[in-house]
Amino acid sequence: MIFRTNYIVIFIVSIFISMLWQPVHLSVFVILIVAWLYVYSRDNEPWVIFGSVIDDSTLVLVLLVLTIGIFLLTDVSRGIVIGVLAGLPVVLVHGMCRRNTEMLFVLEDDEEKVAMNTSSSSLSSSS
């Protein structure tokens, strides 16, 4: 959960590298990334267009439809598939390694809780 943004960045960079030889597709991809980043990094104030309030879910839906439409029009699917396939092993290996260390932290936390419960119960019984 913590590394979700990092995983997305890895996929975006691998897609970006796979599109270096297709400058039109790359520029479209960069424009879409900027649009998505703007949607997620802006303030939570709703947009007002022609007197109508546009909420975030509508904005995300419009951007999603626009993204899919542009991907279909520019035939960028091959570059995206190559980029995702290049980034997938990195993310999977990291996910497997991180899971093992996460389990160690869970075990350490459990041991600390048991030690704290034992010490608190011995303090309460001695008073």
Swiss-Prot record:
Keywords: Endoplasmic reticulum, Membrane, Transmembrane, Transmembrane helix, Transport. It is a multi-pass membrane protein. The chain crosses the membrane at residues 15-35, 53-73, 76-96. It is found in: Endoplasmic reticulum membrane. One of its GO terms (cellular component) is endoplasmic reticulum. GO terms for biological process: vesicle-mediated transport. May be involved in both secretory and endocytic intracellular trafficking in the endosomal/prevacuolar compartments. Belongs to the PRA1 family. This is PRA1 family protein C. The lineage of its organism: Eukaryota, Viridiplantae, Streptophyta, Embryophyta, Tracheophyta.
